[in-house]
Regions:
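Short, charged recognition helix plus adjacent turn
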Residues: 55, 63-73
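Helix-turn-helix DNA-binding elements, focusing on the entry/boundary residues of the two helices
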Residues: 10, 21, 32, 47-50
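Short alpha-helical "recognition helix" segments of helix-turn-helix
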Residues: 24-25, 53
């Protein structure tokens, strides 16, 4: 796994959920550019924030790293 995988996975799961980066950022309690900063490589979430992101995206941390979770997108 690498940072690009994490960034792409957040994007793929967010799209699957049908929410914008802006909406996801605000619903997680951050500035409107929070998710955009993560997926563009300007920042990474802390472990605690990663767990919140997984919860928001309705996936377990294990499923987050499982390629079959978003198969068919």
């Amino acid at each position: 796994m690498d940072i690009d995988f994490i960034r792409q996975r957040i994007t793929d799961l967010r799209i699957k959920k049908g929410v914008s980066e802006y909406k996801m950022s605000l619903e997680l309690g951050h500035s409107r550019s929070y998710i955009q900063n993560i997926v563009s490589g300007r920042s990474l979430p802390s472990i605690e924030e990663f767990l919140y992101i997984c919860e928001y995206l309705n996936v377990t941390p294990k499923a987050f790293f499982d390629d079959s979770v978003i198969a068919g997108i």
